[in-house]
Amino acid sequence: VEKLNVVTPPITAEKRLTVTDKIELPRITMSWLTPPFYEAGDADLDMFGAVLGGGKTSRLYQRLVYRDQIAQSVTASQGSMQLASVFQVEAVARPGVTLEQLEKAIDEELAKMLEKGPTREELERARTSAVAGIIRGLETSQGVADRLNQYNHYLGTPDYLARDMARYEGVTPESVRAAGQRYLKPVSRLVVLGIPGEKVIEDVPRGTPPKEDVQITKTAPDWRATPPGP
């Protein structure tokens, strides 16, 4: 099967959408289109997301949750996929905090990352976590099979582990900053503001399994009454 050659149209102007949903607290989600899985820039943006919002030591968590106490939670990550990836920042406001306050704080931290990139210590911590995650996934035979299948599916070869690790080893603070400046521009994002209210967007429908034509036999078939021959 030939690999699909699909060009995803870029977002050239910021798009904003406000939706109501059955949620308790307002939330904001920012999304950017980024390079596909394993292509140039994917690993850099993976590290960008880890430093910006990949856990309690990340910049956004330290600023929004700990210092300013304006967010219940905040995350940032590179969602790697085959045709195009999505870099996403999501934050849930604390009671009494507006989405405008959240967006302003996120934009400030994002601007700092885009200007100077991560520190070497931040990058090393993110790199170690990413590589450790790959290694942990290889501790079981099922994990090895999944990893080999993933490489074969996306790249056409199962023999990619060493090169996958090398992707992260080759990332530098400068390459992370450059990838962010190229792909995470304000004009290239979709901003969704979620506020409590009636649900206006339905969930993606899930197909129901077909009903099987099962015949229930209440009596044993005739052949069971005949003992097997020698």
Protein language model regions, located:
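Non-catalytic beta-strand/loop surface segments
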Residues: V1-E39, A50-E100, E121-A132, G143-R147, ...
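Substrate/cofactor-recognition hotspot
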Residues: P95, L102, L110, P196
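A common structural junction motif
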Residues: D107-P118
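Zinc-dependent metallopeptidase catalytic helix centered on the HExxH motif
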Residues: D42-A43
